[in-house]
Amino acid sequence: MISRPTTEQILNNCSRELTEVVLPAVEDETVKVTVMMLDLVLRNAALRAAHEIAWMTDEIAAMHEFAGSAGPPTVPSLHLDAVVEAYGAASEAFSAAMESAVAAGDDAKVRRGAELMDRRVGREEELMAGWTPVGR
């Protein structure tokens, strides 16, 4: 029993139940594949739940710095919707700055922007944990 469960813990416990209790009881191969896919979704959601807001706030600051903003706007709260909205605004600022750097031929800034994008893609790949529809 978890006395103070986080979303990550709840999802990981559901994943464990699927793989340790449900999956061994399933005989149909198609259903086994479905259970394995659900397990991947649960584990990915657990990882995202544990870190998503921190990852986005880190990227918000980095994108605004790249864009030359005076400073990232204060996110009104740590509720996911507010952080996602701030992340979207930071992404727009980053995109505009990257377009300007490309148009100006500023290779150093383009490289820095590419590094930021590589970091984002790397984090997304980590988050997806190699997600592909299993067996399909």
Sequence positions of predicted segments:
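A ubiquitous short alpha-helical element
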Residues: 1-7, 26, 78-84
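Hydrophobic faces of stable alpha-helices that mediate helix-helix packing
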Residues: 8-15, 35, 87-95
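Charged/polar positions within long, soluble alpha-helices
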Residues: 19, 23, 43, 47-54, ...
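Amphipathic alpha-helical binding modules
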Residues: 84-136
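N-terminal interaction modules that seed assembly of large macromolecular complexes
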Residues: 3-4, 12-60
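Mid-chain, well-packed structural core segment of small domains
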Residues: 68-92
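Hydrophobic/basic alpha-helical segments enriched in Actinobacteria
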Residues: 15, 32-39, 63, 69-75, ...
